[in-house]
Amino acid sequence: METAFDIISLVLFIVVILLAFFRKVNVGVVAVTFGVIMVRIFGLTDKDLIGGFSTSMFTTLVGITLLFAAITQTGALDLLARKIIALAGNKMWVLPIMVYIAGFVIAGVGPGAVPALAIIPALAAIIAVEVGFNPLMLVLIGEQGLMAGRMTPITPEAAIITGAAAEANIANVMPTILVCQTLVTIVSSFVFWFIFKGHKVKQPLNPIERGTLEKFNAKQIIALLSIVLMLVLLIFVKVNIGVAAFAVAGLLFLFGIADDGKALKSLPWGTIVMVLAVGSLLNIVNKMGGIDLMSNALAKIMTKGTAT
C-alpha cells in the first residue's frame, strides 16, 4: 500500500482542483479539507500539514498587498496613471511602450520580478480603464516588460540562473538570456496588442488635458516615495521584500498617511488563502512522492523538442 501513496496523493490533489473548479469553492479551503484526511491516510500528522504553510510566502503576499492598499487609499496611483495618460495625449500606442519599459526598469534595476509584479499590474490596470484599453492587455504587456527586466545580471533571478549554469560548466549566460527574453516578450506584447484590439483604440475614453490635473499632495508624494523606500531596503539593505513592505506600510499607518483598518479589509484574503493552502497540500503530495512521480512520467515522454 505504501508504494501506492505517490499515486494516491497525486490523484487526490487533482480531485481537489476539479472539485473546487466545478463547485466554485476556494481551492485553498478544499485543499485544507483534503489535507486533514490525507495526512491520516498517509500516517503523517497535522504538523506536516501546518508546516507546509509558507511563512515566507505569507509575509510577501500580505506585506506587498498591504503596502499597495495603503498607497491606493491616497489616490497616488490613480493620479499617476492620469498624468501618464495626459503625457501620451492621443498617441495611444505610446502607453503600452511606457508600461513595458516601466516593468523592465523596475524589475531590472535589481529587485527582480516580485516587487514589480506588485507595482506594474496595478498601474497598468488603472491606465487601461481610463483610456478604454482592455485592462488584461495592458497588464500582460507590463508583465512582459518585467519578465524581460528580471534577466538583467543584477537581479536575484540572474544569480540563481548563473549559479545553475556554472554547475553545468556554462559561463556568461545572462547576456544571451536577456536578449532572448527581451525579444520574446516584445513579440508577445505585440501579439497581446492585436489580440485585445489595442490598435483600434485611437483616443482616450476620457481625454485628459495636462493643465487640468491637480498636483500630487503631500500624502500622495509620501505614498509614492514609500515604493522607492521599499526598493532601497530590498536592494541596498538586503531586507526581505515582504518584511520591507510590511515595515514601510507600518510607517504610512503610523504617520497617518493611510488607514490600516481600511487597508486590511481590502486585502485579497481569498487569494492569499488559496496560495498558502494549496502550497501546504503540495507539500504533502511531495512528501508522498507524488511530485517525483509526475516529474518522472513527464521525463519519459519528453524529447528535446517537446521540452523546449
Describe the role of every protein-language-model region.
Residues 1-60, 68, 180-293:
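Hydrophobic transmembrane alpha-helices of multi-pass small-molecule transporters
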Residues 16-24, 102-112, 143-150, 233-237, ...:
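Transmembrane alpha-helix interface/packing and boundary motifs in multi-pass membrane proteins
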Residues 1, 7-8, 95-96, 102, ...:
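Short leucine-rich amphipathic alpha-helices used at interfaces
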Residues 30, 44-130, 264-308:
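Membrane-embedded alpha-helical segments and adjacent helix-loop junctions characteristic
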Residues 28-29, 111-121, 138, 152-158, ...:
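Transmembrane helix boundary and interhelical junction motifs in multipass membrane proteins
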Residues 23, 41-42, 88, 131, ...:
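A broad structural signal for alpha-helix termini and local helix breaks/kinks
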Residues 127-210:
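Membrane-core helix-loop-helix motifs of multi-pass transport proteins
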Residues 28, 93-94, 136-137, 175, ...:
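Residues that define the loop-to-transmembrane-helix transition and helix capping
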